[in-house]
């Protein structure tokens, strides 16, 4: 389809982006755009068994061209998975300067293209294998890393804090306590960044009301989450294969995505909360493509409770045969799913981060 030149699009996006940081008008918010649409750019979390590993041998960070490609495709949000142990090699210790330099460069590259960057601690609720809240990794260890990150990116509205990727092997009640402690630690630094709060059970939308090992569910345990600035959303993941694991390319039906989001959407509305679909993916076949279009269309129709989405995944180091990989081909051509994602992202971000306007404005901290 016709496109602006790269330079014109970049200038337009940056102007709109910085206009947002100076405050979105209520008239803009009323256009009901989702606001956030993008992709997970993997690489920094690769070779997770190698701690810390060697940069650009075991793991890598996205190149500047990665941001430009997805920005030109209409996206405005990058979710950046990173390993906690690389960011903070020692519990309660300083953040690693090499990793922080890479993170700061990632933020700068995202902002240069008018994009938001989600820092995703991609650790599944553990640190060096120790469950958050357990004897090896007390909650104070978890709050420490977020306190340090909050100080580093304090009130940079381009940076979104993703507390933890897919917590598991932890009850919803235990996780709710850890998440609340992290929110408290972040706000104590006076940072007003948007926070994404996942649930237990790999934060599946389909399993939001399922009991964990102590009988509590995300639907019950997380209703009490409190942010004094009310600048947060609940992060969920939802894949379209039979068991929602994202390990297979086959989709059950064209309505499977909508069916699995429906209860969570109802929960958001009943509890006056906001949601963010931070991971989802499907293979390129007719049923999956229909399911993908239907699911993202459903989110757009329920913009009163959904803030946005980020596809899983892209990144230069993904095998080109990986079914969910939307990183461009070596010849520069697009992966098939981009024919669905790009126009939907462009429409969703027509008012940059309009969803952010539905989060109460930050009041000066006293």
Regions found by a protein language model. Give the residues of each.
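Bacterial N-terminal signal peptides that target proteins for export
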Residues: 2-15
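Bacterial N-terminal signal peptides
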Residues: 13-23
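N-terminal carbohydrate-binding accessory modules
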Residues: 28-77
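Extended, alpha-helix-rich binding/interface surfaces that flank or overlap catalytic cores
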Residues: 38, 294-365
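Solvent-exposed loop/turn segments at secondary-structure junctions
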Residues: 42-47, 77, 83-88, 123-127, ...
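Surface-exposed, active-site-proximal loop segments in enzymatic domains
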Residues: 47-55, 84-101, 123-138, 247-249, ...
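Extracellular glycoside hydrolase catalytic/binding regions
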Residues: 55, 59-60, 143-147, 151, ...
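An active-site-proximal structural segment forming one wall of the substrate-binding cleft
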Residues: 58-76, 94-123, 128-160, 174-189, ...
């Amino acid at each position: 389809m016709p496109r602006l030149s790269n330079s014109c699009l970049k200038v337009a996006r940056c102007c709109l982006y910085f206009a947002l940081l100076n405050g979105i008008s209520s008239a803009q918010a009323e256009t009901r755009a989702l606001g956030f649409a993008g992709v997970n750019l993997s690489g920094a979390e690769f070779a997770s068994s190698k701690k810390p590993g060697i940069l650009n041998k075991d793991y890598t960070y996205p190149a500047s061209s990665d941001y430009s490609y997805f920005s030109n495709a209409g996206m405005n949000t990058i979710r950046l998975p990173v390993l906690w142990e690389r960011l903070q090699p020692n519990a309660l210790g300083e953040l690693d300067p090499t990793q922080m330099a890479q993170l700061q460069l990632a933020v700068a590259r995202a902002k240069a293209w008018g994009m938001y960057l989600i820092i995703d601690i991609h650790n599944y609720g553990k640190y060096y294998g120790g469950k958050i809240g357990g004897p090896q990794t007390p909650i104070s260890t978890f709050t420490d890393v977020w306190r340090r990150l909050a100080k580093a990116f304090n009130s940079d509205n381009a940076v979104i804090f993703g507390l933890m990727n897919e917590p598991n092997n932890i009850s919803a009640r235990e996780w709710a306590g850890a998440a609340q402690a992290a929110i408290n630690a972040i706000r104590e630094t006076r940072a007003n960044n948007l926070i994404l709060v996942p649930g237990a059970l790999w934060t599946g939308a389909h399993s939001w009301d399922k009991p964990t090992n102590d009988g509590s569910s995300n639907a019950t345990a997380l209703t009490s989450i409190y942010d004094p600035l009310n600048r947060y959303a609940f992060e969920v993941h939802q894949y379209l294969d039979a068991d929602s694991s994202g390990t297979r390319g086959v989709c059950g039906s064209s309505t499977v995505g909508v069916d699995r989001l429906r209860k969570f959407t109802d929960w958001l509305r009943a509890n006056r909360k906001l949601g963010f679909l931070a991971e989802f993916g499907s293979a390129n076949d007719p049923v999956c493509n229909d399911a993908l279009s239907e699911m993202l269309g459903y989110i757009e129709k329920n913009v009163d409770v959904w803030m946005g989405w980020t596809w899983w995944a892209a990144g230069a180091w993904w095998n080109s045969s990986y079914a969910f990989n939307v990183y461009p081909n070596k010849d520069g051509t697009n992966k098939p799913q981009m024919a669905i994602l790009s126009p939907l992202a462009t429409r969703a971000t027509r008012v940059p981060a309009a969803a952010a306007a539905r989060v109460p404005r930050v009041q000066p901290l006293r």
